[in-house]
Amino acid sequence: EQRPAPLVRTLERLVPRLAWLYGYDKVPKGLVDRFAWAELAGPQGPVATEEVIIGLVLFAPGCTYPSHAHTGITESYFVLSGSVSQNDDGVFTPGSMLFNPPGRRHRITVGQRDPALLAYAWVGARDELAGQKLSFRKPRK
């Protein structure tokens, strides 16, 4: 049995009660209908806090979440199911952790067979967490 399987079974009861979102103001064409996310704790989550954002993200098989970075935010992922690659740096399976310090560009690619469910945590200053906007544009040189 996979290490996070008991956690996934526990989350199954919570998932229908979450407010799942299916995009942002501007979603890259290849990402439409390929992912959803729900905040568990944070400014928009059922557990209200301005100190951290914790949530779940579900990716469709074969989905590529474009390269992006978070200004002033440290982001960690915990793979709950499926398999993903970050920046083509190997394959991460259930139980794997991924860590992105502030400003590090990263791209998530999901395996072709199964969807991937990841838990994520964002840590940063309150103003950074509250004002975070995702941009999929490459920084100008």
Report the location of each language-model feature.
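A short, N-terminal "cap"/entry segment at the start of jelly-roll beta-barrel domains
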Residues: 1-50
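Conserved short histidine dyad/triad with adjacent acidic residue
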Residues: 33-44, 52-71, 102-105
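Short acidic-glycine-tyrosine-enriched beta hairpin
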Residues: 49, 76, 87-107
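Short glycine/proline-enriched turns and hinge-like loops at secondary-structure junctions
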Residues: 50-52, 69-71, 91, 111-112
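Structural motif
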Residues: 54, 74, 95, 115-116
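Short, conserved beta-strand element in jelly-roll/cupin
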Residues: 56-62, 69-85, 122
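Double-stranded beta-helix
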Residues: 111-141
